[in-house]
Amino acid sequence: MNELRRLTITEMHDGLRRRNFSAVELVETHINAVENEQLNAFITKTPEIAIKAAKIADEHFLKQKDDIPPLMGIPVGVKDLFCTKGIKTTACSKMLENFIPTYESTVSNLLLKSGAAVLGKLNMDEFAMGSANTNSYFGPVENVWIRKSDGAKVVPGGSSGGSAASVAGFLCAGALGSDTGGSVRQPAAYCGVVGIKPTYGRCSRFGMIAFASSLDQAGVITRSVSDSALMLEIICGYDEKDSTSSKRTVPKFSSFINGDIKGKRIGIPKEYKMDGISDEIVHNWEKVSSNLKENGAEVVDITLPHTKYAIPVYYLICSAETSSNLARYDGVRYGFRVDADTLEEMYSLTRAEGFGKEVKRRILIGSYALSSGHYNEYYEKAQCIRALIRNDFIKAFEKIDYILVPSAPTEAFGLNEKPDPLIMCINDVFTVPASLAGLPAISVPVGLSNAGLPLALQVIGNYYDEAGILNMASVIEQNCGRIVNSLT
């Protein structure tokens, strides 16, 4: 492999600034890798856009070496949930197979304005619904990691599986993803990379195809914590086009990564020590907790009593919002259409053929939960319990600074294994609570399992404390070391 692809964003930027290599060289190396990739991570490739950005970057680096945006000339990918003007945006669904937006999402536009070289659009679970990236209309994504015990291919996680696999496979230096119930953090954990979901409202949702509007949030996946800080600085900020975006000033997150965690109180919730979590993850959880103590932090036990209700609450709320958000796909205004004799028949056939199995399952659940006879019993009750979950976190953060939990209960499972939907739901058990509360959280690799697959922990912070969780994650990263796949 060309060594340029193994560099982090920080190292790439430094090399460009020193003129050790050109942006065109850097981007062309990645374009070649994307053209020959075997992971099915990229579904739309935009080499001409990437090369154009690289040429502009080289002109800037020739004129000046300082005060150049950290992503200028850096090869990145964009999850196919974000609308990209003039470039096919499908949400990996047959329903939007040929949809070409006439506008750019705010977060992808911020990447373009920063000078990043966008290599293309990344595979994902259809409409971001899934935890394995096996629900894509364009086929599953493969994880770059292989299970040593039997040589089996494993899933990359989801729904941002293409984003995580492309970064882990050195196809791009960083990737834009989305996180509704763990869709950045869980695939980052499975692929051995860093994934951060900021506070709900930190990033604009304008131009991001809606799944569950009260939960959806853009996030980033990179190979190091410092790289995540750099990307997050670019995509965060107020947007008048999104009424839920925050007007809070966005700090320079990278400047807060100093490794100083002395006196910080880290909570370990007893409710997360549940059945089904692997012994290897428990071991790493305990080891990292001890390491953080050695670095001056205080580790204490806490309780989040309503966590046990998080999964059913999440699936009721997100399915209800899915039912509402996806009602617009009827074959009339845009997207896939089945010709029929009557309007009602066209609606029915279009949605039956245009949506995949998992999407239809969630629409049915959501429609049932919102129906007049069940609204109070299911949806309204779920919202009440969501408030209790949020209040548990608020109360906990009165006495602690951060929460340390696993990112997933197990390592990645086999690509050809078919766990039932209930198992897939439980897979999100550690990421969903922070999403329901709207809190920032970051997944960071902590080692490998006996089968040679990545394991990860998650740091959850208080509202708008992305800087704090990035610094805490950097200490974990320093203690555990970054993991790199030798097969790539």
Curated annotation (Swiss-Prot):
What's its top-level EC category? ligase
What InterPro entries has UniProt attached to this entry?
Amidase (IPR000120), Amidase_CS (IPR020556), Amidase_dom (IPR023631), AS_sf (IPR036928), GatA (IPR004412)
**Gene3D superfamilies with a match to the protein in the record:** Amidase signature (AS) domain (3.90.1300.10)
For this UniProt record, the keywords arranged alphabetically read as follows:
ATP-binding, Ligase, Nucleotide-binding, Protein biosynthesis
One GO MF term on file is:
ATP binding
Q: Which SUPFAM superfamilies match?
A: Amidase signature (AS) enzymes
Catalyzed reactions: L-glutamyl-tRNA(Gln) + L-glutamine + ATP + H2O = L-glutaminyl-tRNA(Gln) + L-glutamate + ADP + phosphate + H(+)
**GO cellular component: a single term:** glutamyl-tRNA(Gln) amidotransferase complex
Highest taxon listed in the record's lineage: Bacteria
Looking up NCBIfam families in the UniProt record yields: gatA
Its assembly, as annotated, is:
Heterotrimer of A, B and C subunits.
Similarity comment: Belongs to the amidase family. GatA subfamily.
Protein purpose: Allows the formation of correctly charged Gln-tRNA(Gln) through the transamidation of misacylated Glu-tRNA(Gln) in organisms which lack glutaminyl-tRNA synthetase. The reaction takes place in the presence of glutamine and ATP through an activated gamma-phospho-Glu-tRNA(Gln).
Name under which the protein is recorded: Glutamyl-tRNA(Gln) amidotransferase subunit A
What taxonomic lineage is listed for the species of origin? Bacteria, Pseudomonadati, Pseudomonadota, Alphaproteobacteria, Rickettsiales
